[in-house]
Amino acid sequence: MAKAPFNIQDQYLNQSRKERVKVIITMMSGDKLEGFIKSFDNFSVLMDYNSDVLIYKHAISTITAADGSFRLHQ
């Protein structure tokens, strides 16, 4: 059976979600949303930003940790 391909995007989002890391999502428009990743799938990210916000991945420019200390486990 073939091994699933390495997906750094899913790994980053999942670790951020599990560890409740506060992230800043910068949108393609330049708007910034700060909150916690609640869930995600192939096309969207559900973020706790005052209330639940569903963000389509194609509208996201970058995702960074709010305090800059987050490191992806290898």
What are these regions (language model features)?
Residues M1-E34, K38, N42, L46-Q74:
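Short glycine-rich, low-complexity segments
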